[in-house]
Design a protein with these regions (language model features):
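Peri-catalytic and regulatory segments of divalent metal-dependent proteins
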Residues: 2-159, 178-184, 191-235, 239, ...
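Active-site-adjacent, His/Asp/Glu-enriched structural segments that form or flank metal-binding
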Residues: 171-173, 187-191
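Short hydrophobic alpha-helical membrane-entry/anchor segments
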Residues: 159-165
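Flexible hinge/switch segments at interdomain interfaces of large molecular machines
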Residues: 94, 98, 165-171
Length: 245
């Protein structure tokens, strides 16, 4: 898992989030860059050129597919990073971060059997970014104090950890409440499914991968008692989402 980051590093030098408005592209990118810098320094960050090339060969067609479908504006494509960060963690997890960063754990890569299954998860996370779900979720909290904004950043990082790691990083009821605000709404999850499905098809991947990956996650949801599938905590499966597929 990603190593625990000191609380003090999360609150210093944060971009201004405005007053009650969604975060601007510039502010979201700066926030994402700061989080990425912390993750790059983490000992569990994995720099593997071969694996990165494999992931890029999936990621880049998805980004182009989103652009072709009109989901990704030229401004957003230019100003966001569109980079992948790989974690050594064996838990099954992937997560979108502000500013166009995508985090993927080795555990997720190890359970997929096809590129199409992995593409389905990456397309879903990409759609959270293109639809500005992070900005919309955090914009609702723009009046919070800098300390709580820092807690939100730690909450994002904790999403890449086990439940125990998240508990260690986020302390106090207010901070836990801040973390909960980062969970995408049910409508956002379904929107990311729908748009991600289309993007995946546009990029030339077999959309059956979406269905088979959902099946794996559904099976894991019924069997998971060890916390090794944190993706299911941040992306709970519902009968509606399954029916949409």
């Amino acid at each position: 898992m990603w190593s625990q980051l000191p609380t003090s590093t999360a609150t210093g030098g944060l971009p201004a989030l405005g007053d009650g408005a969604d975060i601007t592209l510039s502010a979201e990118r700066k926030l994402g860059d700061r989080i990425a810098r912390e993750l790059y320094r983490d000992p569990d960050y994995l720099e593997d050129p071969v694996l990165d090339e494999y992931l890029q060969n999936i990621w880049q067609p998805l980004v182009k597919g989103a652009q072709a479908r009109g989901e990704l504006s030229p401004e957003l494509q230019e100003r966001f990073a569109w980079k992948i960060l790989i974690g050594r963690d064996r838990s099954v997890n992937a997560f979108a971060l502000p500013g166009g960063y995508l985090g993927i754990h080795l555990g997720l890569i190890s359970v997929v059997t096809t590129r199409d299954e992995l593409a389905s998860v990456m397309a879903h996370e990409l759609s959270h970014v293109t639809q500005r779900h992070i900005s919309r979720s955090m914009g609702d909290q723009a009046r919070m104090t800098p300390w709580l904004i820092g807690a939100m950043i730690l909450g994002m990082l904790a999403a890449s950890k086990s439940a125990q790691g998240a508990q260690a990083m986020i302390v106090g009821g207010q901070a836990m409440a801040a973390q909960s605000q980062l969970n995408f709404s049910r409508d956002m999850e379904r929107e990311a499914d729908r748009i991600g499905y289309g993007v995946m098809s546009e990029a030339g991947f077999d959309t059956l991968g979406f269905v088979t990956m959902f099946g794996k996650l559904q099976q894991a949801a019924g069997l998971n008692d060890s916390g090794s599938f944190p993706y299911l905590r941040s992306h709970p499966l519902s009968s509606e989402r399954m029916a949409d597929m």
